[in-house]
Amino acid sequence: RKREGLLQCVFEEGKTKFDLKELKEASTIEVEGTVRAEHRAPNGFEVRLDTIRVLSESAEQLPFAISKWKLPTTLETNLDHRAIALRNVRERAKFRIQEGVVRGFRDFLYSEGFTEIHTPKIGAKSAEGGANLFRLEYFHRPAVLQQSPQFYKQMMVGVFDRVFETAPVFRAEKHNTKRHLNEYTSLDFEMGYIDGFEDIMAMETGFLQYTMKLLERDYAKELKMLGVTLPNVEQIPAVRFDEAKQKVAEKYHRQIRNPYDLEPEEEALIGQYYKEECGADFVFVTHYPSKKRPFYAMDDPADPTYTLSFDLLYHGLEITTGGQRIHDYQMLLDKIEKRGMTTEGMEQYLSAFKHGMPPHGGLGIGLERLTMRLLDEQNVRETSLFPRDVTRLEP
């Protein structure tokens, strides 16, 4: 097993002085020999061994067989022995594809004139607010782990116009589900001088189109190994939040229980609806209610009870939240006051708007969720290298 995949070696008794019976599974070895074509071998060739040298021996038996095509273990056991489980070629392939997604995000945004930034993950205040914060002591001062780079992204629009970041974010949500992590990687961007939130949706569509071509070109081996069929991203339909609720209620005879947010079952049905109606794998749901969006979300001038924002659903799972932001200083202050919030701790953020900000917007994409849907996995922990959830702090 090498970085490139499996390598088939042929040992002939008597050709070398090495006793093959002494070789333990998972030992690290160095070999020399003659390379020969063999269509039945992985990658179409094999090595006829002349010498074998053991670089390091395995000190004990593996907790499970990593040479199997699929690991013969539960997800919990997999995660308990993560560094070993990831040596399996299929497990490893998942994260090669995830690498391709991040690479596509970076490459595409660089080509669109974005600047990569790196923002703090410890702060005095969170952009999203609320109770779902990891709190800590920072040299005898209260601090939090950031839920989002939102404030920093917006401030940097006033500097670079277009910025992006790939980094961890932290959510102290006590959800023990197949779709939630308490630490995950967020693919964020923010762009200035937009005409509307549709520009943000178009930029994400471009990223997805670019990335699917990249995966098809450079990660074909991993896609084939995992049996992945890449999604259709030629066109992504969009539907208003209230219309989406009505459509699935009528078609699937479902009562609307929460008029202000989408329940997971509704998201799944919206995905099903657009797959059945137009063969779409993705759908943008736009104009979420203002009361369910943060204070910096731009309200719809035509109906301020809704916002110029969106979520992107992939096979019925939310993978993106984004939209247009408020760029007017007084409008921001009015929204903060209307919500009964305080500006304490937001002085630096508001200062950027006090001194002029362009119309702008952005989004955040959950990398692990996107990868989970790409690979058709059923649990987001399958696509997190070392997942952190409500029960797991190790490894």
Where are the predicted features?
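Extended, domain-scale alpha-helical bundle/helix-rich regions
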Residues: 192-200, 205, 245
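Metal-assisted phosphate- and nucleotidyl-transfer catalytic regions
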Residues: 127-128, 206-315, 338-351, 355-356
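Short intrinsically disordered coil segments
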Residues: 62-71, 181-182, 204-206, 299-302, ...
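Generic, well-ordered alpha-helical scaffold segments in large soluble proteins
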Residues: 100, 104-112, 148-158, 162, ...
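TRNA-recognition modules of translation machinery and tRNA-sensing kinases, especially anticodon-binding
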Residues: 25, 158, 162-165, 181, ...
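Alpha-helix initiation and N-capping motif
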Residues: 72, 79, 83, 102, ...
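Extended, non-catalytic structural segments that build the interaction scaffolds
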Residues: 93-97, 227-233, 320
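Class II aminoacyl-tRNA synthetase-like tRNA-binding/catalytic domains
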Residues: 1-194
